Amino acid sequence: LEEVDRFIEHEIKPLENSNDNIRFFDHRREDARTDWERNGLPNEEWEALLGEAKRRAIAAGIFSYPFPSVHGGRDGGNLGMAIIREHLAAKGLGLHNDLQNEHSIVGNNIGLLLMLEYGTPEQQADWLPGLKSATRGFAFGITEPDHGSDATHMETVAVRDGDDWVI
């Protein structure tokens, strides 16, 4: 945690405080993050700022904490990630960690866990470098009546029927 704190103090806070970037985190944040001319999509400047923070975290080796050491990471597990996320959340809203859009200087990467657990060696070779460099990512969208976006309580199932799937 001390290494993460030093990184935040020396790299992230100066970036957050330059060019009025603080507008993305104070009372102006919703308007500053939103491009109203593009139907409410995220503002490109906001996205670029998140990208720069992530690039710095990657260069410092902070972002790759959860990756296995054989893939250039630090073998960080779920408990370690939970401790780091709680530590970052306790610091309040900022460029170091923004739960509104799952941005974090420490990679919170569901795709990594899925790929390590279920990916073939070929898929891992294809996907892991991009996940570690944040040039590739996973996303999923789910919703069910009475469950919203809680992936752990979904009731819909898919059953293989020959070459097809029946939902």
Predicted regions and their residues:
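Short, conserved phosphate-binding/catalytic loop or strand-edge motifs used
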Residues: 104-112
